[in-house]
């Protein structure tokens, strides 16, 4: 068997398995998953949702070919103090969110946990304001409590 770099004998399974395991580390997705690199850089630290305080309201310009100012807020997370930008979904949502309000944010649902649509660098969206669903406030079913 000249030229073969792999063991080809009858009892070579263990050796072949070890060799495969060694080569898996060149696969970027495998390496990121095993070393939990996503969790280490994620401001939410792997959690599906997080609470935070609104620091400021910001308008973010959408990417080409669209032209709009998307209403967002800068949120400081309570668990670690990191500041992230979160999108305010819904018509007139900015009117119901003020600075120093407590909000709950979650992922915006972009590909591979990244930004969504024409919003550059925005990975999260606001779902609750002062403990009440933003969707219910916008529909007029519930009122935003004053803190």
From Swiss-Prot:
Subunit organization: Part of the 30S ribosomal subunit.
GO biological process, any: translation
Name of the protein described by the UniProt record: Small ribosomal subunit protein uS12
Lineage summary: Archaea, Thermoproteota, Thermoprotei, Thermofilales, Thermofilaceae
Family: Belongs to the universal ribosomal protein uS12 family.
One Pfam family linked to the record: Ribosom_S12_S23
Domain of life: Archaea
The protein's role, per its UniProt record: With S4 and S5 plays an important role in translational accuracy. Located at the interface of the 30S and 50S subunits.
Keyword list, A-Z: Ribonucleoprotein, Ribosomal protein, RNA-binding, rRNA-binding
GO CC entries: small ribosomal subunit
Disulfide-linked positions: none
Alphabetized PROSITE patterns for the sequence: RIBOSOMAL_S12
Gene symbol of the encoding locus: rps12
MF terms (GO), sorted A to Z: rRNA binding; structural constituent of ribosome
């Amino acid at each position: 068997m000249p030229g073969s770099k792999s063991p080809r004998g009858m009892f070579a399974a263990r050796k072949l398995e070890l060799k495969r395991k060694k080569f898996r580390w060149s696969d970027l997705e495998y390496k990121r998953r095993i070393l939990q690199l996503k969790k280490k850089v994620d401001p939410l630290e792997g959690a599906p949702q997080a609470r935070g305080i609104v620091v400021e309201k910001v308008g973010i310009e959408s990417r080409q070919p669209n032209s709009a100012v998307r209403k967002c807020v800068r949120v400081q997370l309570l668990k670690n103090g990191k500041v992230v930008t979160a999108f305010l979904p819904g018509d007139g949502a900015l009117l119901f969110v003020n600075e120093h309000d407590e909000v709950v944010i979650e992922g915006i649902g972009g590909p591979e946990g990244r930004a969504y649509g024409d919003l550059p660098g925005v990975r999260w969206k606001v779902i609750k304001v002062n403990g009440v669903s933003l969707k219910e406030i916008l529909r007029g079913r519930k009122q935003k409590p004053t803190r």
